[in-house]
Amino acid sequence: MSYASAQHDRMIAGAVKACYVVAVDLSASPPVCRVSDGSEWVSAWVRWHSIAAGKARHWRAPSLGEQGSLISPSGDVSQGTFVPGLYGNAGPPPDNRDHVEVWRFDDGGSLVYDWQAKSYTITLPSGTVAIKVGGTEVVVTDNAVTVKSGTIDLEATVNIKGPVNIDGALSVTGNIDGAGNIMAAGNSDNHHKH
């Protein structure tokens, strides 16, 4: 085989290679990974593709063992970039329905949007979910929900089960109906006469 033919074959073979991640360097700028095709060959450090890298940016580092493809211009694998996310031994599909988007994580957490059911479910086995908009913040933990805001308006019937503590003034424009005792400064006010 001539040199030109051998080079041509090498370029074709290197253009797209099925491979998996064998190393990740998150401290590099930009972060990089090394991939292997399962033989003794291991790539140089290469960048990986993300969902978005412009004004909107997405971050997810590929996992060790994650399968994907190395795309190399002119078959030069040293110039390749890795496209992660090929289902296989390292990670089976998290779902198989055509009307959902699903993220599942190793700790048991998940993000599931089902546009047929019009449902978005965030599941954490433990920890914290925080939503911040300017100075307003909602924090959900294993055993509490904390809301911080300048004003909270509720336009609905509100049902509360359990004790209620109010640390501040209370202003009411309608009636107050109570089936139990009404205490004022430690004294029952139920039968107070004017």
Label each region the model flagged.
Residues 1-119:
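Exposed beta-strand/loop interface patches that mediate assembly or binding
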Residues 126-194:
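Intrinsic low-complexity, repeat-rich intrinsically disordered segments enriched
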